[in-house]
Regions:
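Short, polar/proline-rich extracytoplasmic segments that appear immediately after membrane translocation
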Residues: 2-63, 68-71, 184-220
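Broad hydrophobic/π-residue packing in well-ordered secondary structure
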Residues: 22-28, 36-37, 81, 94, ...
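Alpha-helical structural elements
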Residues: 20, 63-65, 71, 75, ...
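Aromatic/His-enriched, Gly/Pro-containing loop or helix-boundary segments
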Residues: 58-70, 145-160
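C-terminal, structured domain-capping segment
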Residues: 71-101, 152-220
């Protein structure tokens, strides 16, 4: 027997830069979008508008969240895309993917069990462009797992006449058909949150130093 569930994806926007060696952050938050801004870097994160069956809605602008009714074995369109806005200084960018209900996810053999990887749930990650960083971060207290993907090079929008959209982090997701009804019920309402981050490249010796400073300043 096949069951359906709702998978909620929240797109979170974040921006940052360095100024005279100092990082300062301005934050604004509402129920749908968490925006972090600093300096001369601006990004957006969005995805194709789809209906609850995961089908693209023609003529609908890209949006920051979609809701799904899922059936195991069916692929659903989802293409979180980070765009560097024209006029932005050269910046390092990354995307973080956080899933809740991890204690339930790791019990599902079809998703890899304790060896769960994001690729067991989504399709289309271009690993030559988006570089997975080390092991995922597991937060047992909040029951989440987070994967970090850094873009393979700094992106410069300072001399461009148009915004610079990067390749989507992935383009679809699927709940494998071997998932049982009990397993499906356990992850009903699971939330995936995709965060976009950018930090101005100037003033740092490289991307590692930049992200270390970003994480220290924001508590990421």
């Amino acid at each position: 027997m096949k069951r359906s569930l709702i998978l909620i994806l929240s797109i979170v926007l974040a921006l940052s830069a360095s100024t005279l060696g100092t990082l300062a952050y301005l934050t604004d938050e509402d129920s749908a979008v968490n925006t972090l801004t600093v300096g001369n870097v601006q990004i957006t994160v969005d995805e194709t508008a789809v209906n609850t069956s995961g089908e693209a809605i023609q003529g609908e602008p890209r949006r920051q969240a979609n809701h799904y009714h899922l059936i195991p074995g069916v692929s659903y369109t989802k293409d979180p895309t980070l765009t560097v806005v024209k006029g932005s200084s050269q910046a390092y960018v990354r995307m973080l993917v956080k899933l809740d209900k991890y204690s339930c996810i790791k019990k599902i053999a079809a998703l890899g069990g304790d060896a769960f990887a994001l690729e067991n749930l989504v399709n289309g990650i271009n690993s030559s462009l988006w570089k997975l960083q080390a092991d995922p971060t597991i937060d047992e207290q909040n029951d989440t797992i987070t994967f970090e993907y850094r873009y393979h090079q700094a992106v410069d929008g300072s001399d461009t006449a148009e915004d610079v959209p990067l390749e989507p982090l992935f383009n679809q997701f699927i709940i494998p058909s071997p998932v049982t009804s009990d397993e499906l019920q356990a992850i009903d309402g699971m939330q995936i949150t995709v965060y976009g981050h950018a930090i101005q490249a100037a003033g740092f010796s490289g991307e590692s130093a930049a992200w270390d400073a970003f994480d220290q300043e924001t508590g990421s």
